[in-house]
């Protein structure tokens, strides 16, 4: 066998996209200077977990990480897919961080993909699993992905800091994608959403729905927000609550906003076991519903911060696919 020629890259920017494109194009990459000047240099736990996930769904994939984690080599293999796979995503980032590149790779695998992901289903950093199911999967259908076999099942929920959620992702294989020209966002014609609560009173959900309807009912009549209260093992390991909203437009575009309220992770600046004051459920419903009806051109960091009185716990989803 000949010597492997690696394409050299620097830094940790857009790491998921780099790994996705390297895998699809079968291009070995070597990434250097990963946070080399930070107080905590090297790959983060969720980035290492993503590399291990790529190993799990691929055949003949090779990952080599140096001792400090500031450099790694990634030689992609053949994406095989497969059924009954299981991966623990950890609690550094939510499952949505892994779902976005995983669903693309699953489309081009040798076999249909069925994988169980464990970890955090809802947080304030990544798109929650409800948003992914309500917006990302229908978006893929616009590119010719069949609805048969494309499914995300939420079996239990988990929020920071300890997670405990589980989802089951199923992705069919395709031969090619259909090109799409899509420049008109259209006008909002209906709004769907879901609230959730884990290890807290279900009254939090009713309060969020009441606040959201206070905005939506003045604009359009077709609004349905469902509740999903979890208890027992399906409620994960930490208390929390949140909401996911999807506004569908006349052109088939999906405008989404979601958030989850829970106690902070230790790496988010909180102390393990420290009881912080949580954002009131009424404010959650009001702010997220306001973000959901923003024009898509205003979904930028500056606009989100200006309209976000918390400065941290709400996001309008652009995510992996962007705009």
Predicted regions: what they are:
Residues 1-323:
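Structural preference for solvent-exposed beta-strand-turn elements
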């Amino acid at each position: 066998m000949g010597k492997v020629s690696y394409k050299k890259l620097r830094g940790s920017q857009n790491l998921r996209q780099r790994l996705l494109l390297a895998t699809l194009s079968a291009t070995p990459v070597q990434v250097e200077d990963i946070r080399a000047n930070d107080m905590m240099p090297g790959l983060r736990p969720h980035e290492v977990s993503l590399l291990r996930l790529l190993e799990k769904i691929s055949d003949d994939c090779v990952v080599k990480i140096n001792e400090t984690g500031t450099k790694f080599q990634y030689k992609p293999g053949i994406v095989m897919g497969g059924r009954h796979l299981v991966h623990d995503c950890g609690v550094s980032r939510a499952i949505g961080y892994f779902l976005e590149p995983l669903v693309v790779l699953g489309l081009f695998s040798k076999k249909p993909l069925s994988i169980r992901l464990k970890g955090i289903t809802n947080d304030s950093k990544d798109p929650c699993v409800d948003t992914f199911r309500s917006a990302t999967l229908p978006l893929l259908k616009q590119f010719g992905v069949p609805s048969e076999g494309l499914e995300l099942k939420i079996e239990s929920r988990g929020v920071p800091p300890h997670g405990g959620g589980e989802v089951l992702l199923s992705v069919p294989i395709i031969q090619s994608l259909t090109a799409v020209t899509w420049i008109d966002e259209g006008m909002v014609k209906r709004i769907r959403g879901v609230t959730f609560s884990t290890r807290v009173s279900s009254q939090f959900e009713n309060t969020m729905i009441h606040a959201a309807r206070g905005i939506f009912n003045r604009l359009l009549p077709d609004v349905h927000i469902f509740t999903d209260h979890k208890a027992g093992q399906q409620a994960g390991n930490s208390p929390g609550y949140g909401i996911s909203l999807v506004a569908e437009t006349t052109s088939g575009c999906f405008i989404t906003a979601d958030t989850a309220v829970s106690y902070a992770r230790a790496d988010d600046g909180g102390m393990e076991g420290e009881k912080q004051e949580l954002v009131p459920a009424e404010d959650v419903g009001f702010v997220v519903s306001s973000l959901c009806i923003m024009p898509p051109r205003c979904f930028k960091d500056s606009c989100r911060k200006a309209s976000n009185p918390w400065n941290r716990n709400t996001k309008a989803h652009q995510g992996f696919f962007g705009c």
